[in-house]
Amino acid sequence: MGDVEKGKKIFVQKCAQCHTVEKGGKHKTGPNLHGLFGRKTGQAPGFSYTDANKNKGITWGEETLMEYLENPKKYIPGTKMIFAGIKKKGEREDLIAYLKKATNE
């Protein structure tokens, strides 16, 4: 899988403006991502999701995140995440490696 340190840099550049990862972290424009792996879409307590996110019904894991992060609006039409996606597979792998570690600490 990807490189955790490279993934952290990608998170800081592309995700941290809207998301936190630490346990008990606050929601920003996007939800706190702690405990993301193994959780269904639209389930972070206290965050106001669109129906599209709540109704997608998939469980977040490496494969689902690879697809989602490539093109969020294609994967979940109606999501309010304003992010074009990460086209480079290696960058997505690095980000997912970081998320897997950081959202589980």
UniProtKB/Swiss-Prot annotation:
Function: Electron carrier protein. The oxidized form of the cytochrome c heme group can accept an electron from the heme group of the cytochrome c1 subunit of cytochrome reductase. Cytochrome c then transfers this electron to the cytochrome oxidase complex, the final protein carrier in the mitochondrial electron-transport chain. Plays a role in apoptosis. Suppression of the anti-apoptotic members or activation of the pro-apoptotic members of the Bcl-2 family leads to altered mitochondrial membrane permeability resulting in release of cytochrome c into the cytosol. Binding of cytochrome c to Apaf-1 triggers the activation of caspase-9, which then accelerates apoptosis by activating other caspases.
Recorded GO CC terms: mitochondrial intermembrane space
SUPFAM superfamilies according to UniProt: Cytochrome c (SSF46626)
Gene that encodes it: CYCS
Main location: mitochondrion
Binding site for heme c: C15, C18, H19, M81
Subcellular location: Mitochondrion intermembrane space
Record PTM text: Binds 1 heme c group covalently per subunit. Phosphorylation at Tyr-49 and Tyr-98 both reduce by half the turnover in the reaction with cytochrome c oxidase, down-regulating mitochondrial respiration.
Modified residues (N6-acetyllysine): K73, K100
Transport found in the keyword field: yes
GO biological process: apoptotic process; mitochondrial electron transport, cytochrome c to oxygen; mitochondrial electron transport, ubiquinol to cytochrome c
PROSITE patterns, per the entry: CYTC
Keyword terms: Acetylation, Apoptosis, Electron transport, Heme, Iron, Metal-binding, Mitochondrion, Phosphoprotein, Respiratory chain, Transport
Phosphotyrosine PTM sites in chain numbering: Y49, Y98
Xref: InterPro entries: Cyt_c-like_dom, Cyt_c-like_dom_sf, Cyt_c_1A/1B
UniProt name for this protein: Cytochrome c
